[in-house]
């Protein structure tokens, strides 16, 4: 099932021209639109990566991107559909899961206090100047976990004492305490590529999710199609503010980098960097993401 969902994702990336060829303003050869056009290595690995994906989809050729298309928004939509597809087939566990595109953080139990904080900052200019807008975060994609009736959880699990387990978000009967809001189980940030500003934005979002919550920290993940190992390392390396970076086609990228190093042995460190991140559990393929989200 995961293999089929991954294959559908790759097919849609090409068929819907999300992963596509981009004409250069200078009139030179078209480049794959995940490449850094100013970096020859990035252009070559992106081309090798796209060709490996194309061969697996059995589409005849890579198409030209749609003029004015926002790859980031299209990428988010594809990843959201992939997660809905996969999580709907994962082994059942306590609570019901829902994949949602970018609701405000104060829609979730751990962050409900941000609603009042926003109201106060709207009313008081000095507070607004002090706080700024760092707390106003809308993750690209979230996985929400909904509270359950006691009957769903099982009387034997809770026992018959009404004075027990009154603070947990998972019990719907605790609605008076937390408005029966869903729990933010995971945040999935979608970054089509990882230029330095995008990597830094992802880190800032992650730190705000950690700092601003009351209760458990959600899983904090990033999905990308970035072809350059050094750019992946800019986000994957670090102290663990992000759980893990997931590549939309890691196995194909590993093959593309191997081919590139065969062509240019001086770039052997590209392959070494990629292997180091995978070995260190900082980088994984998107097929791992559904399992990690429910574990």
Locate predicted features:
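C-terminal tail/extension regions appended to the core domain(s) of diverse proteins
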Residues: 1-74, 78-92, 97, 212-295
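Acidic-basic catalytic patches of nuclease active cores, encompassing PD-(D/E)XK
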Residues: 58-162
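Short, conserved, surface-exposed binding loops centered on an aromatic residue
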Residues: 133-134, 176-181, 212-214
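Conserved catalytic cores of phosphodiester-cleaving nucleases, focusing on short active-site segments
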Residues: 141, 184-190, 202
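Active-site beta-strand-loop-beta-strand hairpin of nuclease catalytic cores
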Residues: 145-186
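Short, flexible loop/turn elements at secondary-structure junctions
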Residues: 145-147, 191-194, 224-227
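Active-site-adjacent loop/helix micro-motif of nuclease/hydrolase catalytic cores
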Residues: 151-155, 193-205, 216, 230-233
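A short, acidic, amphipathic alpha-helical segment used as a generic capping/interface helix at domain edges
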Residues: 207-210
């Amino acid at each position: 099932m995961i293999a089929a969902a991954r294959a559908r994702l790759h097919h849609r990336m090409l068929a819907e021209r999300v992963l596509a060829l981009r004409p250069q303003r200078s009139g030179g050869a078209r480049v794959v639109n995940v490449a850094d056009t100013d970096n020859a290595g990035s252009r070559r690995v992106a081309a090798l990566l796209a060709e490996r994906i194309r061969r697996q989809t059995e589409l005849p050729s890579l198409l030209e991107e749609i003029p004015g298309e926002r790859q980031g928004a299209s990428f988010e939509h594809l990843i959201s559909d992939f997660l809905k597809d996969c999580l709907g087939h994962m082994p059942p566990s306590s609570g019901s899961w829902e994949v949602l595109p970018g609701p405000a953080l104060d829609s979730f139990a751990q962050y409900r206090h941000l609603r009042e904080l926003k109201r106060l900052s709207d009313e008081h200019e000095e507070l607004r100047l002090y706080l700024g807008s760092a707390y106003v975060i809308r993750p690209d994609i979230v996985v929400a976990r909904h509270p359950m009736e006691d009957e769903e959880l099982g009387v034997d699990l809770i026992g018959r004492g009404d004075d027990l387990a009154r603070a947990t978000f998972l019990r719907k009967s605790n609605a008076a305490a937390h408005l029966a809001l869903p729990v933010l189980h995971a945040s999935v940030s979608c970054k089509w590529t990882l230029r330095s500003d995008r990597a830094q934005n992802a880190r800032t979002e992650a730190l705000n999710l950690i700092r601003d919550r009351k209760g458990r920290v959600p899983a904090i993940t990033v999905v990308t199609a970035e072809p350059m190992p050094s750019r992946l390392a800019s986000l994957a390396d670090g102290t663990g503010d992000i759980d893990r970076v997931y590549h939309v086609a890691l196995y194909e990228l590993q093959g593309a980098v191997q081919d590139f190093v065969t062509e240019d042995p001086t770039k052997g460190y590209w392959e070494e960097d990629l292997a180091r991140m995978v070995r260190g559990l900082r980088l994984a393929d998107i097929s791992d993401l559904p399992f990690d989200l429910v574990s």
